Protein backbone atom coordinates (compact mmCIF):
# COMPACT_ATOMS: atom_id res chain seq x y z
CA UNK A 1 0.00 0.00 0.00
CA UNK A 2 1.00 3.64 -0.35
CA UNK A 3 1.14 3.92 3.44
CA UNK A 4 3.80 1.21 3.75
CA UNK A 5 5.64 2.29 0.59
CA UNK A 6 6.17 5.76 2.07
CA UNK A 7 7.24 4.47 5.48
CA UNK A 8 10.79 5.59 6.30
CA UNK A 9 11.91 2.12 7.46
CA UNK A 10 10.56 0.50 4.30
CA UNK A 11 12.23 3.09 2.07
CA UNK A 12 15.53 2.59 3.93
CA UNK A 13 15.31 -1.20 3.54
CA UNK A 14 14.70 -0.86 -0.20
CA UNK A 15 17.64 1.53 -0.56
CA UNK A 16 19.91 -0.71 1.55
CA UNK A 17 19.04 -3.69 -0.65
CA UNK A 18 19.76 -1.70 -3.79
CA UNK A 19 23.07 -0.40 -2.43
CA UNK A 20 24.13 -3.93 -1.46
CA UNK A 21 23.15 -5.33 -4.86
CA UNK A 22 25.15 -2.65 -6.67
CA UNK A 23 28.16 -2.99 -4.37
CA UNK A 24 28.23 -6.75 -4.88
CA UNK A 25 27.50 -6.51 -8.63
CA UNK A 26 24.67 -9.02 -8.37
CA UNK A 27 23.60 -10.59 -11.65
CA UNK A 28 20.27 -12.08 -10.58
CA UNK A 29 17.42 -11.72 -8.10
CA UNK A 30 18.56 -14.91 -6.34
CA UNK A 31 22.00 -13.40 -5.74
CA UNK A 32 20.35 -10.32 -4.24
CA UNK A 33 18.14 -12.39 -1.93
CA UNK A 34 21.16 -14.32 -0.65
CA UNK A 35 23.15 -11.20 0.32
CA UNK A 36 23.88 -10.76 4.05
CA UNK A 37 21.92 -7.99 5.77
CA UNK A 38 21.77 -7.26 9.49
CA UNK A 39 22.70 -10.75 10.57
CA UNK A 40 20.26 -12.28 8.11
CA UNK A 41 19.89 -12.53 4.35
CA UNK A 42 18.09 -9.95 2.24
CA UNK A 43 15.23 -12.40 1.74
CA UNK A 44 14.87 -12.82 5.51
CA UNK A 45 15.03 -9.06 6.04
CA UNK A 46 12.11 -8.62 3.63
CA UNK A 47 10.14 -11.33 5.45
CA UNK A 48 10.84 -9.64 8.80
CA UNK A 49 9.64 -6.28 7.45
CA UNK A 50 6.50 -8.00 6.16
CA UNK A 51 5.77 -9.29 9.66
CA UNK A 52 6.20 -5.81 11.12
CA UNK A 53 3.90 -4.09 8.62
CA UNK A 54 1.36 -6.89 8.43
CA UNK A 55 1.45 -6.74 4.63
CA UNK A 56 2.79 -9.44 2.34
CA UNK A 57 6.11 -8.44 0.80
CA UNK A 58 8.30 -10.18 -1.71
CA UNK A 59 11.44 -9.14 -3.54
CA UNK A 60 10.47 -10.32 -7.01
CA UNK A 61 12.24 -7.95 -9.39
CA UNK A 62 15.81 -6.88 -10.05
CA UNK A 63 17.19 -5.30 -13.20
CA UNK A 64 20.55 -3.79 -14.01
CA UNK A 65 22.59 -2.53 -16.95
CA UNK A 66 26.33 -2.40 -16.53
CA UNK A 67 28.40 0.32 -18.19
CA UNK A 68 28.08 3.93 -19.34
CA UNK A 69 25.48 5.90 -21.34
CA UNK A 70 22.44 4.61 -19.44
CA UNK A 71 19.24 6.66 -19.34
CA UNK A 72 16.61 5.95 -16.67
CA UNK A 73 12.94 6.84 -17.12
CA UNK A 74 10.47 6.76 -14.22
CA UNK A 75 6.98 7.04 -15.71
CA UNK A 76 5.12 9.93 -14.07
CA UNK A 77 7.70 9.83 -11.25
CA UNK A 78 5.69 7.26 -9.30
CA UNK A 79 8.13 4.31 -9.46
CA UNK A 80 5.36 2.10 -10.87
CA UNK A 81 6.94 1.75 -14.30
CA UNK A 82 10.65 2.28 -14.83
CA UNK A 83 12.87 1.70 -17.84
CA UNK A 84 16.58 1.84 -18.60
CA UNK A 85 18.18 2.29 -22.01
CA UNK A 86 21.87 2.05 -22.82
CA UNK A 87 23.34 3.53 -25.99
CA UNK A 88 26.70 2.87 -27.61
CA UNK A 89 27.72 6.51 -27.18
CA UNK A 90 26.56 9.54 -25.16
CA UNK A 91 23.10 10.67 -26.35
CA UNK A 92 21.09 11.86 -23.36
CA UNK A 93 18.03 13.18 -25.21
CA UNK A 94 17.75 10.28 -27.65
CA UNK A 95 18.26 7.69 -24.90
CA UNK A 96 15.57 9.34 -22.78
CA UNK A 97 13.12 9.34 -25.69
CA UNK A 98 13.79 5.67 -26.38
CA UNK A 99 13.35 4.90 -22.68
CA UNK A 100 9.86 6.41 -22.97
CA UNK A 101 9.33 4.22 -26.05
CA UNK A 102 10.19 1.14 -23.99
CA UNK A 103 7.70 2.21 -21.32
CA UNK A 104 4.91 2.76 -23.83
CA UNK A 105 5.45 -0.10 -26.27
CA UNK A 106 6.90 -2.85 -24.04
CA UNK A 107 9.25 -4.49 -26.58
CA UNK A 108 10.28 -8.10 -25.93
CA UNK A 109 13.76 -7.79 -27.44
CA UNK A 110 16.25 -5.33 -28.89
CA UNK A 111 16.09 -6.72 -32.43
CA UNK A 112 15.20 -9.91 -34.29
CA UNK A 113 18.51 -11.56 -33.42
CA UNK A 114 17.86 -10.91 -29.72
CA UNK A 115 14.50 -12.70 -29.63
CA UNK A 116 14.96 -16.02 -27.77
CA UNK A 117 14.67 -19.01 -30.09
CA UNK A 118 11.93 -20.50 -27.91
CA UNK A 119 9.85 -17.35 -28.42
CA UNK A 120 10.45 -17.43 -32.17
CA UNK A 121 9.43 -21.08 -32.34
CA UNK A 122 6.24 -20.47 -30.37
CA UNK A 123 5.30 -17.38 -32.40
CA UNK A 124 5.88 -19.26 -35.68
CA UNK A 125 3.80 -22.18 -34.43
CA UNK A 126 0.94 -19.83 -33.55
CA UNK A 127 1.28 -18.02 -36.90
CA UNK A 128 1.10 -21.29 -38.85
CA UNK A 129 -1.92 -22.56 -36.90
CA UNK A 130 -3.74 -19.23 -37.25
CA UNK A 131 -3.04 -19.18 -40.99
CA UNK A 132 -4.34 -22.73 -41.41
CA UNK A 133 -7.48 -21.91 -39.43
CA UNK A 134 -8.13 -18.87 -41.61
CA UNK A 135 -7.70 -20.84 -44.84
CA UNK A 136 -10.06 -23.56 -43.63
CA UNK A 137 -12.61 -20.96 -42.51
CA UNK A 138 -12.51 -19.28 -45.93
CA UNK A 139 -13.10 -22.61 -47.66
CA UNK A 140 -16.04 -23.44 -45.38
CA UNK A 141 -17.63 -20.03 -45.91
CA UNK A 142 -17.23 -20.34 -49.68
CA UNK A 143 -18.89 -23.77 -49.62
CA UNK A 144 -21.79 -22.51 -47.50
CA UNK A 145 -22.33 -19.52 -49.80
CA UNK A 146 -22.26 -21.74 -52.86
CA UNK A 147 -24.89 -23.99 -51.26
CA UNK A 148 -27.07 -20.96 -50.54
CA UNK A 149 -26.85 -21.02 -46.75
CA UNK A 150 -26.84 -17.91 -44.55
CA UNK A 151 -23.37 -17.47 -43.01
CA UNK A 152 -24.69 -15.94 -39.81
CA UNK A 153 -27.03 -18.84 -39.18
CA UNK A 154 -24.31 -21.35 -40.06
CA UNK A 155 -21.69 -19.68 -37.85
CA UNK A 156 -22.28 -21.74 -34.71
CA UNK A 157 -24.49 -24.32 -33.04
CA UNK A 158 -26.16 -21.53 -31.10
CA UNK A 159 -27.06 -19.72 -34.31
CA UNK A 160 -28.30 -22.93 -35.91
CA UNK A 161 -30.62 -23.60 -32.96
CA UNK A 162 -31.78 -19.99 -33.05
CA UNK A 163 -32.47 -20.31 -36.78
CA UNK A 164 -34.57 -23.43 -36.24
CA UNK A 165 -36.55 -21.79 -33.41
CA UNK A 166 -37.30 -18.74 -35.56
CA UNK A 167 -38.25 -20.87 -38.53
CA UNK A 168 -35.43 -19.55 -40.72
CA UNK A 169 -34.14 -23.07 -41.40
CA UNK A 170 -35.39 -26.59 -40.83
CA UNK A 171 -33.71 -29.20 -38.65
CA UNK A 172 -32.80 -31.05 -41.85
CA UNK A 173 -31.10 -27.95 -43.27
CA UNK A 174 -29.21 -27.52 -40.00
CA UNK A 175 -27.89 -31.07 -40.36
CA UNK A 176 -26.88 -30.33 -43.95
CA UNK A 177 -24.97 -27.27 -42.78
CA UNK A 178 -23.18 -29.27 -40.08
CA UNK A 179 -22.17 -31.96 -42.55
CA UNK A 180 -21.02 -29.46 -45.17
CA UNK A 181 -18.91 -27.58 -42.62
CA UNK A 182 -17.36 -30.81 -41.35
CA UNK A 183 -16.49 -32.34 -44.72
CA UNK A 184 -15.24 -29.07 -46.22
CA UNK A 185 -13.03 -28.34 -43.21
CA UNK A 186 -11.54 -31.84 -43.29
CA UNK A 187 -10.87 -31.72 -47.04
CA UNK A 188 -9.31 -28.25 -46.90
CA UNK A 189 -7.16 -29.07 -43.87
CA UNK A 190 -5.81 -32.16 -45.64
CA UNK A 191 -4.89 -30.22 -48.77
CA UNK A 192 -3.42 -26.94 -47.57
CA UNK A 193 -0.47 -25.77 -49.72
CA UNK A 194 2.51 -25.82 -47.36
CA UNK A 195 4.52 -23.13 -49.13
CA UNK A 196 1.63 -20.67 -49.12
CA UNK A 197 1.01 -21.33 -45.43
CA UNK A 198 4.70 -20.79 -44.68
CA UNK A 199 4.81 -17.55 -46.68
CA UNK A 200 1.81 -16.12 -44.85
CA UNK A 201 3.21 -17.24 -41.50
CA UNK A 202 6.53 -15.57 -42.34
CA UNK A 203 4.63 -12.36 -43.00
CA UNK A 204 3.05 -12.64 -39.58
CA UNK A 205 6.49 -13.16 -38.06
CA UNK A 206 7.77 -10.00 -39.75
CA UNK A 207 4.84 -8.12 -38.22
CA UNK A 208 5.70 -9.62 -34.83
CA UNK A 209 9.31 -8.42 -35.12
CA UNK A 210 8.17 -4.94 -36.16
CA UNK A 211 5.82 -4.66 -33.20
CA UNK A 212 7.93 -6.45 -30.58
CA UNK A 213 11.58 -5.56 -31.30
CA UNK A 214 12.62 -2.15 -29.99
CA UNK A 215 14.78 -1.05 -32.93
CA UNK A 216 12.13 -2.23 -35.42
CA UNK A 217 9.19 -0.53 -33.73
CA UNK A 218 7.56 2.60 -35.09
CA UNK A 219 8.93 5.54 -33.14
CA UNK A 220 6.11 6.82 -30.92
CA UNK A 221 6.92 10.47 -31.58
CA UNK A 222 7.08 10.03 -35.36
CA UNK A 223 5.39 6.97 -36.87
CA UNK A 224 7.07 7.62 -40.23
CA UNK A 225 10.33 6.22 -38.87
CA UNK A 226 11.48 3.29 -36.77
CA UNK A 227 13.37 3.66 -33.51
CA UNK A 228 16.56 2.67 -35.32
CA UNK A 229 15.96 5.34 -37.97
CA UNK A 230 15.25 7.94 -35.29
CA UNK A 231 18.58 7.20 -33.61
CA UNK A 232 20.46 7.34 -36.89
CA UNK A 233 18.83 10.67 -37.74
CA UNK A 234 20.72 12.08 -34.75
CA UNK A 235 23.95 10.15 -35.32
CA UNK A 236 24.55 7.55 -38.01
CA UNK A 237 26.47 5.37 -35.56
CA UNK A 238 24.03 5.71 -32.65
CA UNK A 239 22.13 2.62 -31.51
CA UNK A 240 20.73 0.97 -28.39
CA UNK A 241 22.83 -1.80 -26.89
CA UNK A 242 20.56 -2.81 -24.00
CA UNK A 243 17.27 -1.98 -22.30
CA UNK A 244 15.28 -3.05 -19.25
CA UNK A 245 11.67 -2.52 -18.25
CA UNK A 246 10.11 -3.11 -14.84
CA UNK A 247 6.56 -2.50 -13.71
CA UNK A 248 4.60 -3.13 -10.53
CA UNK A 249 1.39 -3.39 -12.54
CA UNK A 250 0.08 -6.65 -13.92
CA UNK A 251 0.27 -6.54 -17.73
Where are these regions (language model features)?
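N-terminal assembly/interaction segments in proteins that build large macromolecular machines
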Residues: 1-251
Amino acid sequence: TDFVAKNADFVKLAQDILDAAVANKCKSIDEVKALPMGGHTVAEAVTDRSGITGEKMELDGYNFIEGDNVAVYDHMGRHMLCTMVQTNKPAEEEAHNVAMQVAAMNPVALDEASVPQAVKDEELKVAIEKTKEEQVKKAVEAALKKAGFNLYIAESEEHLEEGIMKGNITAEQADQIRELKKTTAEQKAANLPEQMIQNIANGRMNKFYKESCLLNQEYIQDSKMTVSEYLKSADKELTVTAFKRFTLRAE
